[in-house]
UniProtKB/Swiss-Prot annotation:
CC terms in the record's Gene Ontology section: mitochondrial inner membrane
Pathway: Porphyrin-containing compound metabolism; protoporphyrin-IX biosynthesis; protoporphyrin-IX from protoporphyrinogen-IX: step 1/1
Domain of life: Eukaryota
Function summary: Catalyzes the 6-electron oxidation of protoporphyrinogen-IX to form protoporphyrin-IX.
Obligatory cofactor(s): FAD
Protein name, as recorded: Protoporphyrinogen oxidase
Binding positions for FAD per the UniProt entry: G9, S10, G11, I12, S13, G14, I289, V511, G512, I513
Amino acid sequence: MIQKVGIIGSGISGLSSYYYLRNGINLTSKFSKNNLKINIFEKSNKVGGNIQTRIIQGKNKDEKIIVEEGPRSLRALGRGLNTLEFIKRLGISNDIIFSSANSNGKFVLLDGKPKEIPMTSLFDIIKFSFKHSIVSSILKEPFKKVPSQVKEMDPNWDESVHDFFSRRLGKTMTKTFIEPTILGIYGGDYTNLSIKSTFKRAALLEPFGGLILGSLFKSKKQKQFELDLDKNEKRLLPSKNELTELFDKDTDKTNVFSFKENGLSRMIQKLKSLIESDSLTKLYLSTSIVEIEKDVTNGTLKVTDNKGNQYQYDQLISTIPLNQLAPMFKKSDSKLYQLLQSVNYTSIAVINLIYKSNKNVVKIISDKGFGYLVPSKENQSVIGVCFDSNTFPEFVNNNNNNNNDNDNGNEKDQSIITVMIGGNNGIKDRNDNWIDVTNTSKDKLLDIALKHLDKVLDIESSPDFTNVSIYDNGIPHYNIGHQNLINEIQNHITKNYGTTLLLGGNSIDGVGINDSIHKSKQLINSLKLSNN
């Protein structure tokens, strides 16, 4: 019987694991876990992991500007439905705001300037396709040869995102549109990123024919296969009908959301307050785990922290990056240590810029959607630029009286721009201006960001506020064969630890916040605790 649980990490994965442990995995749970003792360990002095929101005073004393130093928004699609349900259960759904329609535009930097990718008008799509020489790629795609391993659905088959889409769509379309998408999500090197771990659905559906035109003419077999895929993916997900009142807020139908007061940190703050009011849960800040070993007498796990304290747990859940978990098994399990070290990560720098009284900047970015992504072929040091004040105007028009009237003029001369630099070091093989952010000073990174905005957007003004955050090994990089590696890790754990040790976080299956919360739900469900 599980009586004492340890959780390593207090990012959204660790905090959501705590929540599901204490409250059950669904809305109808009447969880009686009052006897379950939970300890949460965090090596830093604050919770939240990569979710860190900063509040900056606006141009007036009663205004505040919301700046996201890490992830900037959530999507209410797929696993995002589970996140919306999670937010509803936390009791903070009234704080949700959906993004503005002004951020709907999708842009890519081409020939040194942001170019919009048409999404609505068929004529514009055709015109754009001819201009960028991708029409033939789309027309030929259904007739591309499928490798024998794919036809046979070999479970061990994997290839890079680059090779998959180059084979299906051609090199021009792949390097122009697929690669910047990968940079925006993973900061990844698409020549070594696993197709099965990033575009799993596309990889699984390839044996049935074309991914684009072919999807319009599905065979009965393909339709059934997709139904089975959807059924498996939607397990543990609520239906959209259960969340109608939240989707009614999305008047612009953007599916992108955050929180009006404190950005994404609103979730973190709420979860932290629940932990602080829970007498059977203890949060250890500035405490790292240095060793984990199995107690052969009873199968529990013995944990030692950096202060020499020892703990014993019936259940241990790790939500930290696997390469950070690895050293904890160096003495007790050399095989697991080696396996965990084999998972790769990417470093990225996020540069936040605020312009408080600058109508020119507002004018420059107002028609450029959420921002733009930068293909490596552009040979830029920057991999993406986000116009956060386009996405959430409330973030620059947020005063202490909660007066968010867009007609008061407060937001019209204030802007938030976020610049991303870095990514996986494999990018340097095709981009001479790639920057190793872990070996570059923050001042230099800021200078690169400002010079980029000057060159590309003609923004010469100095920002009123700047912040540079470097996430060293901050994003998992799912290399080719990633899923086989994860399976090997899981098999080793099952054989040697049973279900006493569970792995969560974003190193397994999906790097986003939605993925992390959903993974926590899956883990707690796997424990088969009563009233789940």
